[in-house]
Amino acid sequence: MRIALCSYSQKEKETALLMKLGKVDRFDNGVFCVYAMQREGPYDAVVIMEDGARGMNFCMSIRGYSRDVQLLWISDQAEFEPQSRRLQADTFLVKPVTEYQLRE
């Protein structure tokens, strides 16, 4: 499984969990993730690990390019769940997340 991790900061714990699921490419900018998908084809999943407006910007970049890629937004702010639906994220999780939640 090819996974794109979109996050401005290094998230060691979450990255380690994702690496158990497949190959992880990390991007600190949603635009760079889109460029990678244009060059190398779509990812099986894009995981956004940013809160608030930063997370929303990542979602908008990814959804602006592809409505088909599986999009997971992980935030520590539960109040952004309605925005995740509006931005068509497939899944919204509140930190901390478990390996079990990521596998679902």
Predicted regions and their residues:
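CheY-like receiver
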Residues: 43-104
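Short, aromatic/basic amphipathic alpha-helical patches
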Residues: 14-22, 61-62, 86
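Acidic, metal-coordinating helix/loop segments flanking the phosphotransfer/catalytic sites
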Residues: 28-45
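A structural preference for short, hydrophobic beta-strand core positions in alpha/beta folds
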Residues: 26-29, 73
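Conserved acidic segment of CheY-like receiver
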Residues: 1-18, 26, 46-47
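Charged/polar, solvent-exposed surface patches and flexible loops
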Residues: 16-19, 35-36, 64, 104
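Active-site-proximal cofactor/substrate-binding loop regions of enzyme domains
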Residues: 9-10, 14-15, 33, 52, ...
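A structural signal for short coil/turn segments at secondary-structure junctions
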Residues: 22-25, 41, 66
